[in-house]
Each structure stands twice: as structure tokens, then as C-alpha cells.
């Protein structure tokens, strides 16, 4: 009834008075009134005056219960067919400026997803209402009777609306009946931990007072108000309305909802006609921007309708002359909307309702403002609640001590957020600060909406300074120098218009607790601008900074820095270790080490080792050894030797030998040796040897050796060795070794070793080693070892040795040798020898030797070595020293591989020395 009165009033005001004067007949009045009543509904002015009524008197809606999940819900799309053609319209992308990401429409259809509150009306009269729902969210469809329109002109108009973080949608004509489909949205804010005690019910969360006062300026909006036209809201057909959001909205985490609309425009619409979108008072369309605008609806590059926001926060769109020339115009619209902090002041459930005419959509969401940050007795939280990009200003509201704890000597500082390119200007000229005291913490709104009239202004009682660039400092000068109630600090600042950075601020509260411990607590706020629009309140989070080292210390302004951390480490370790190991290894290692080691080791070990090792070793060795050796050895050797030797030897030897040798040897040797040796030796040997050897050796050796050795050795060795060794060794060795070693070794060794060794070893090793070692070792070792070893070794060695040997030998040899030797020797020897030998030899030899020797050796040796005073027929106890110096072509020390020929070569060496000495003596006599 009221609508009819309004319609008559509108007709009488605009049309009927003029018609009665001109026509003056009742027939004309009757004909005109029936048509004008349908086309001339409320004007914009009337719509504005009745907006509150339409908000409360819209057709019934179904409120969706809150969900337990956060599934996003998208706007709906409605499709219908027309007789001859259709025109679809979507809103323009870049016209709406807000502080949060908004959505865009896409030209795709997708299957429905859960949780959208959507209402759709069809262009078919008397179509029954249906409800589409998922989980606990409900959708409502309300029938709306409309007139079908026909057209012979087919126009398709499309444009893309680009508020961010959304999915574009376009209405598609399909069938006569209207189908509603949902598109998924990616717009849900990521939730953070919330305090369940802060969740209030709807009547606590929503301020029901009216009228609403918006945070944005409507002056510019009013200036853009269109010329009054006809309100055709109820003549729109195929109307769809949707509220797209998760079940929880976090306003202080840039959370927002999307309002989605779709409709068809009647062909009778003309330029100046309007329609209204009702927006719930719990939402606003500006976020934190000071002025709100709504996007125009675009048809390609042409404006279909322009929108403004009225004083109640609703949206009025006015059609342009585009509709005068087009039929079957369809449009879709998406607007981001934000929780209004003035009307929703606390955390709790809120029911949102929006619509076009009698078509509405409802959805209940949980608004979660989250709690302040707290660290011991310090609590703080801030938010950026207003930005004016026109004047380059911002407003930040900070709650200091919202928990109401006791804070002694409190100090608040504000500065740019570290490690960001913040565009804020903080100084005395660009920053204004107000401080308010709150007597009761319950008076603080969780939405950070502040009415200054409700609190005491104490700005003049505090000390505000700007101690550093881009930093302010607020000292709360209370009589007892402590605070026990909350304070509100409102900062009005400026933004650098020339900066490309975002607005990022840090607020830090310092203070003592009751135990007089100085601590600090910080809160960060950010706002990012994207595509010319503000992106909301930003991601707010508490920060616990590094605590001050000194009481009263204020955090300095951080500066950008690049750091290249470096570390120095030193380690001092003493280790005592014992191990049983069997290894098959292939290693390629490069090492440069300098070590200074002083170790004293007393070891008593019984070892039974069965090891299979395959070794391929490439080693480059440069060795400087200083060795002092005193060796007393008893040896009993039984040798049976079968030797086949093919030797090509080029030797340049300068030997000065003084040998005193006392040897008692019983040797039984059975040796099968196949040796291929090519030896190039440049040897300067000065040897001083005092050897007393008693050796009992039983050796069965099968050795296949291919040796290429490159060794540069400077060895100074002082060794005192007392060795009693009983060795039973069965060794099969296959070794391929390429050794390059650079070693400088100074060794002073005093070794007393009693070793009973039974070794069975199978060793296959492939090793490539590049070692540069500088080793200074002082070792005192007392070792009692019982070792059972079975060794199978395959050795391929490439050795280049440069040896300088100084040897002084005093040898007393008593030898009984019975030798049966079968020797096949092919020797090519080029020898240049300068030898000065003084020998006192007492030799009694009984040797029984059967030797079959096949030797093929290639050795390049350049040795500069002072060898230890080792016995000629050493036992297994000296294997450790021999292994270290095995690459040096030194005299045979009685190892397992050479024990079988020691007696023969000792006898030959004695005879050769006597002959050489006699020849020199004869040469001297001739001279």
C-alpha cells in the first residue's frame, strides 16, 4: 500500500500533472497510469530516504549457520536464454580502490563448492524456490516475477573485473530455466591462533546502534551523485547474490569478504535509471582507506553504470546511455567488503545480509580480532586503521599495556620495521602523537575503534621525543614511575610520496617487572598497496625482540647490513682408541695438513685380524724424515727361494759406508718371487749402522709386484728399537699404487716392542691420494702386541724415489749358510759408484738356500734418506716402520717379502765390500 502511494506521488510529481493539463481526459490518465506505475518507481532521492526501511523490510532470508571449516565460497552465476540475443556485462577492474585484495571475474564455469550463501531469481513466473547448501551454510533462492524481453539485436559485451585474489565469472546463456553454479574462491585469510574466551555471541559482537558513521569521507561521493532517475531495482531479472568468505574472518590479518551480484537489465531501461545494492552495517567498502569508491560496471571500454555510496553505506548504480542502444544486457559485479570496526567491536559471530531488491543472501561468520601480544608483564598491539593516499597520511592506533599489568619505567618507541623499505616519515614535522589513559581495560574495543571523548587525554603529561631519525619515543611520566592501566597511543604520520616501499611500522614497549628485570616487546604493522589500491590492515603479529643487555637500554635503529660470517675453530684432543677393522675402500683424496702431535702411547694388544684389501693408490710423496734408531734384533730365518729376476739397473751411487755388523743368522727360506723391476736410482748414501740381529724367521711369500715409485725423501731418523719378534706370515699381496707424497717428518722414536704376529691378510685397495703433510711427531710407544694376520695383498706400485741416505754401519756377522740357488738373471747395469767403506766383518755363514727368482722391476729412485739402524734379517715387529718407508729403496730389513734372500745378499755384500776395499787399497798402493 505504501508503495502504491509512493508511485502515485512520483507520477503526480513528474508526469500526471503535466498530462492532466495537456490532455484533461480520464481515458488518457488511465492508459498512462498503468504503464508509468511499472516504469517509474522510487527515484534516487526517494530511495535514499527509504534506505533504512528497505534494509529492514527486504524479503525473508535464510541465515547460514557458522561452519567449522574455512572453506571458501564463491559468487554465483545465473544463466538464461533470450529470444534472439544477449549482452553480458562485468565490472571494470581497476576503478575500485581499497586496502585489501579484491576479486576478479573469469569466463569459465565450474562445479559448485561448499559453503556459499547465494540467492537466485529466475525470469520464469511461479518457479518454486529451491535451496542449495553444503555443510552448515545455506543458500536461499527467492522467486521474482519478471517480464521476458525479446530483441532482434544480439550484443555480447564482456569485460573483466580485477579486484585481486578472485576468480572471474561470466554469465552464459544455456537453457530456459536458470541454473546457479558456484566458482571456487581463494580469498580466505589464513587463520592464526585465537583465544576462545574472546568469542562472543552476535548480540555482543555487533553494535546495533544506528545510524552508522562510516570511517570514509562521503563528500566526494555526494558530489558524484547522479541526476534523479527511475529506480528499477525490482525490475532487474535473473538476480543472483552471494557472500564469499571463509567461516572465520580475521580483520587484522587483511581478512575480508566478497559480495557477488549478477542480474539482467530490462530492455526498457534508459540513461539515468538506478538500482540499489544493500550492504550490511557490519561491513564497509573502504577498509582502511579514508575515501570509499565502488567500481563502475564496464561493457568493454564503455561504462554501463556508475556507482556511489549513500550515507547509509548502500550502493546506488546509475545506468549510462549504453542501455539506450542495447537489449538483453546482463551484468556481474564483485565488491570486496571489510568488517566495520565501529559496528563490530568485539570477537564473535556476525550474520551478514546483502541483496538487490527482494533477492538477498545471508551468511554467519566468526569475526576474530585476535589478542594482543604479551611477553612477561609487557603487552602491546597496534593497527593501521586509516590511510589517505591523496594527502599521503596514515593513522596508527597502539594499545600499550592492554593486559593492565604493572610495568615499571615504561618506554614506548616507534620506528620503521627492520629489513623493509618502509615509506613512513617519522620526525617532529611529519608525526603527531596523542596519548590517552584508559582506567578500565574492559573499555578497550577489540576492533581498535577509539572514540577519544571516552578517554582521558594525557598527551601533555608524557614526554614525547624523536631521539633518532625515523624514531619516536614516549616516556610515561607517572608519579611513581610505573603504569598499571592501559594507554592508547594514536600516531598520525605521513608517507613519503616518492618512495616505492610499503607502509611498515614497528612499535616496541620497554620496561621493568617487579623483579627489576628490563625487557622489551614489539608489534609490527604493514600495509601494502597493489595496483593503486590499499591492501588492508596487513599482517599483524607480535615480535619478541632480542632483549636489551643493560637496564634502560633502548634498541638502536637497525641499519641494513651485509654480513659474511667467518669462523675460527681450534681443537685439542687426546684420544685412546682400539679397533678391529676389515675394509675394502676406493678413495681419492686431496689433503693439505700441518699437524704437531705429541703422543705417549702404552699399548698391550692381542689382535686376530683377517682382512681383505684391494688397494689402488696414487700417491706423491715428498718426505723429510729425521730418524734416530737403535735396534737390537734376534732373527732365525729359514728361507727357500726361487727367484727369476730380470733387472735393468742404472745406478749412480756415491756411498760412504762404515759398517760394524754382528749377525747370528739361521735362515730357512722358501721364496717364489716374480719381480719385474726397472730401477733408475740416484743415491747418495751415508750410513752409520750398528746392528745386532738375532732372527728366527719362517716366511712363505708369494709376491707379484709391479712398482712404479716416485719418492722425494729427506729423512733424519733417530730410532732406538728393541724388538723380539716371532712372526708367521702368509701374505698374498696385490697392490696397485701410484704415490705422490710430499712429507716433512721429524721423528724421535723410542720403541720397545715384543710382538708375536700371525697375520693372514687379503688386501685389495684402490686409493688415489694427494697429500701435503708437515708433521712434527714426538712419540714414546711401548707396545706388546699379539697379532694373528692372514694377508692377501695385490700391489701395483709406481714409485719415483729421490733418496739421500747417510748410513754408518758396524756389522758383526756370524753366518752359517747352505745355499742351493737356481738363478736366472738378466741384468743390464750401468753403475757409477764412489764408495768409501770401512768394514770390520767377522762372518761365519752356514746357508742352505734354494732360490728361484724371476724379477722384473721398474724403479726410479732418488733417495735422500737416513734410515733407522734396522737388522738385516728383521722380524715382523718392524713391519710398521717398514710400511712407512716402503717406497724407499733401502737395504733389506728382513721383512716378510725379502727375508728369503737376506742371507745370500748379506754374504755377497760382505764379499763385495772386502773386494772393493782391497781394490781401493791396491789403487792407493799403485799411486
UniProtKB/Swiss-Prot annotation:
Changing residue 528 to V: 2-fold reduction in clumping titer compared to wild-type. The keyword Signal applies. One of its GO terms (molecular function) is fibronectin binding. Changing residue 532 to A: 2-fold reduction in clumping titer compared to wild-type. One of its GO terms (biological process) is cell adhesion. Keywords: Cell wall, Peptidoglycan-anchor, Secreted, Signal, Virulence. It is a peptidoglycan-anchor. GO terms for cellular component: extracellular region. Residues 34-200, 529-898 are annotated as: Disordered. A motif (LPXTG sorting signal) lies at residues 890-894. Pfam families: Big_8, Gram_pos_anchor, SdrG_C_C, YSIRK_signal. NCBIfam families: LPXTG_anchor, MSCRAMM_ClfA, YSIRK_signal. Cell surface-associated protein implicated in virulence. Promotes bacterial attachment exclusively to the gamma-chain of human fibrinogen. Induces formation of bacterial clumps, which diminish the ability of group IIA phospholipase A2 to cause bacterial phospholipid hydrolysis and killing. Significantly decreases macrophage phagocytosis possibly thanks to the clumps, clumped bacteria being too large to be phagocytosed. Dominant factor responsible for human platelet aggregation, which may be an important mechanism for initiating infective endocarditis. Belongs to the serine-aspartate repeat-containing protein (SDr) family. This is Clumping factor A. It comes from Staphylococcus aureus (strain NCTC 8325 / PS 47). The gene is clfA.
Amino acid at each position: 500500500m505504501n508503495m502504491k502511494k509512493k508511485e502515485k506521488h512520483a507520477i503526480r510529481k513528474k508526469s500526471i500533472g503535466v498530462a492532466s493539463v495537456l490532455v484533461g481526459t480520464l481515458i488518457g490518465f488511465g492508459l498512462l497510469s498503468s504503464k508509468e506505475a511499472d516504469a517509474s518507481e522510487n527515484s534516487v532521492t526517494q530511495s535514499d530516504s527509504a534506505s533504512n526501511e528497505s534494509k529492514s523490510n527486504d524479503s525473508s532470508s535464510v541465515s547460514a549457520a557458522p561452519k567449522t571449516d574455512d572453506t571458501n565460497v564463491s559468487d554465483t552465476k545465473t544463466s538464461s536464454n533470450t529470444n534472439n540475443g544477449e549482452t553480458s556485462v562485468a565490472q571494470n577492474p581497476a576503478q575500485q580502490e581499497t586496502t585489501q585484495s579484491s576479486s576478479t571475474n573469469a569466463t569459465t564455469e565450474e562445479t559448485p563448492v561448499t559453503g556459499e550463501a547465494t540467492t537466485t531469481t529466475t525470469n520464469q513466473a511461479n518457479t518454486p524456490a529451491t535451496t542449495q547448501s553444503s555443510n552448515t551454510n545455506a543458500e536461499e533462492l527467492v522467486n521474482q516475477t519478471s517480464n521476458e524481453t525479446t530483441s532482434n539485436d544480439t550484443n555480447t559485451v564482456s569485460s573483466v573485473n580485477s579486484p585481486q585474489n578472485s576468480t572471474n565469472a561470466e554469465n552464459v546463456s544455456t537453457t530456459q530455466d536458470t541454473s546457479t553454479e558456484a566458482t571456487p574462491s581463494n580469498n580466505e585469510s589464513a587463520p592464526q591462533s585465537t583465544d576462545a574466551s574472546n568469542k562472543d555471541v552476535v548480540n555482543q559482537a555487533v553494535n546495533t546502534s544506528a545510524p552508522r558513521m562510516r570511517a570514509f569521507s562521503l563528500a566526494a561521493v555526494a558530489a558524484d551523485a547522479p541526476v534523479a532517475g527511475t529506480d528499477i531495482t525490482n525490475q532487474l531479472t535473473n538476480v543472483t547474490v552471494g557472500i564469499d568468505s571463509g567461516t572465520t574472518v580475521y580483520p587484522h590479518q587483511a581478512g575480508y569478504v566478497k559480495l557477488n551480484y549478477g542480474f539482467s537489465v530490462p530492455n526498457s531501461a534508459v540513461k539515468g535509471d538506478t538500482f540499489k545494492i544493500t550492504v550490511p552495517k557490519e561491513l564497509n567498502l573502504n577498509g582502511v582507506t579514508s575515501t570509499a569508491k565502488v567500481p563502475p560496471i564496464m561493457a568493454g571500454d564503455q561504462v554501463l553504470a556508475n556507482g556511489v555510496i549513500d550515507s547509509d553505506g548502500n550502493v546506488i548504480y546509475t545506468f549510462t546511455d549504453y542501455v539506450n542502444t542495447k537489449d538483453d544486457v546482463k551484468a556481474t559485479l564483485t565488491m570486496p567488503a571489510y568488517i566495520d570496526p565501529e559496528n563490530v567491536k568485539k570477537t564473535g559471530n556476525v550474520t551478514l545480509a546483502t541483496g538487490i531488491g527482494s533477492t538477498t543472501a545471508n551468511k554467519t561468520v566468526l569475526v576474530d580480532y585476535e589478542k594482543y601480544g604479551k611477553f612477561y608483564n609487557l603487552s602491546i598491539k597496534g593497527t593501521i586503521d586509516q590511510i589517505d593516499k591523496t594527502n599521503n597520511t596514515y593513522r596508527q592506533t597502539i594499545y600499550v599495556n592492554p593486559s593492565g599489568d604493572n610495568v615499571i619505567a615504561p618506554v614506548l618507541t616507534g620506528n620503521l620495521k627492520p629489513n623493509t623499505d618502509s615509506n613512513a616519515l617519522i620526525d617532529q614535522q611529519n608525526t603527531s602523537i596523542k596519548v590517552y589513559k584508559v582506567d578500565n581495560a574492559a573499555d578497550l574495543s577489540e576492533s581498535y575503534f577509539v572514540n577519544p571523548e571516552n578517554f582521558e587525554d594525557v598527551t601533555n603529561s608524557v614526554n614525547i621525543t624523536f631521539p633518532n631519525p625515523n624514531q619516536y619515543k614516549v616516556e610515561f611520566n607517572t608519579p611513581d614511575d610505573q603504569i598499571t592501566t592501559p594507554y592508547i597511543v594514536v600516531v598520525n604520520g605521513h608517507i613519503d610520496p616518492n618512495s616505492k616501499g610499503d607502509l611498515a611500522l614497528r612499535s616496541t614497549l620497554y620496561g621493568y617487572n617487579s623483579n627489576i628485570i628490563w625487557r622489551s616487546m614489539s608489534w609490527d604493522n604493514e600495509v601494502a598497496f597493489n595496483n593503486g589500491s590499499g591492501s588492508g590492515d596487513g599482517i599483524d603479529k607480535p615480535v619478541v625482540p632480542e632483549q636489551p643487555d643493560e637496564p634502560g637500554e633502548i634498541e638502536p635503529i637497525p641499519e641494513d647490513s651485509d654480513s659474511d660470517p667467518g669462523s675460527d675453530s681450534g681443537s685439542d684432543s687426546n684420544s685412546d682408541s682400539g679397533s678391529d677393522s676389515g675394509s675394502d675402500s676406493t678413495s681419492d683424496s686431496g689433503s693439505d695438513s700441518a699437524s704437531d702431535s705429541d703422543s705417549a702411547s702404552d699399548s698391550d694388544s692381542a689382535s686376530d685380524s683377517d682382512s681383505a684389501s684391494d688397494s689402488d693408490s696414487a700417491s706423491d710423496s715428498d718426505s723429510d724424515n729425521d730418524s734416530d734408531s737403535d735396534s737390537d734384533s734376534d732373527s732365525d730365518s729359514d728361507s727357500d727361494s726361487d727367484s727369476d729376476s730380470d733387472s735393468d739397473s742404472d745406478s749412480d751411487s756415491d756411498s760412504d759406508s762404515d759398517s760394524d755388523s754382528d749377525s747370528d743368522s739361521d735362515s730357512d727360506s722358501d721364496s717364489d718371487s716374480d719381480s719385474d723391476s726397472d730401477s733408475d736410482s740416484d743415491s747418495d748414501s751415508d750410513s752409520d749402522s750398528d746392528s745386532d740381529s738375532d732372527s728366527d724367521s719362517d716366511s712363505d711369500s708369494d709376491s707379484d709386484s709391479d712398482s712404479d715409485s716416485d719418492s722425494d725423501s729427506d729423512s733424519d731418523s733417530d730410532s732406538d728399537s728393541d724388538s723380539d719378534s716371532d712372526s708367521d706370515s702368509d701374505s698374498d699381496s696385490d697392490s696397485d699404487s701410484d704415490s705422490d707424497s710430499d712429507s716433512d717428518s721429524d721423528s724421535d722414536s723410542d720403541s720397545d716392542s715384543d710382538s708375536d704376529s700371525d697375520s693372514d691378510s687379503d688386501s685389495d685397495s684402490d686409493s688415489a691420494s694427494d697429500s701435503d703433510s708437515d708433521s712434527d711427531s714426538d712419540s714414546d710407544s711401548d707396545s706388546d702386541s699379539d697379532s694373528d694376520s692372514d694377508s692377501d695383498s695385490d700391489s701395483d706400485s709406481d714409485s719415483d724415489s729421490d733418496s739421500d741416505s747417510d748410513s754408518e754401519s758396524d756389522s758383526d756377522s756370524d753366518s752359517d749358510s747352505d745355499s742351493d740357488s737356481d738363478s736366472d738373471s738378466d741384468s743390464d747395469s750401468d753403475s757409477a759408484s764412489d764408495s768409501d767403506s770401512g768394514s770390520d766383518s767377522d762372518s761365519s755363514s752356514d746357508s742352505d738356500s734354494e732360490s728361484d727368482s724371476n724379477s722384473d722391476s721398474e724403479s726410479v729412485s732418488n733417495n735422500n734418506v737416513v734410515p733407522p739402524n734396522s737388522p738385516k734379517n728383521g722380524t715382523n715387529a718392524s713391519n710398521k716402520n717398514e710400511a712407512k718407508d716402503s717406497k724407499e729403496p733401502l737395504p733389506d730389513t728382513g721383512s716378510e717379502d725379502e727375508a728369503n734372500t737376506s742371507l745370500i745378499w748379506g754374504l755377497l755384500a760382505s764379499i763385495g765390500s772386502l773386494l772393493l776395499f782391497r781394490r781401493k787399497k791396491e789403487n792407493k798402493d799403485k799411486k
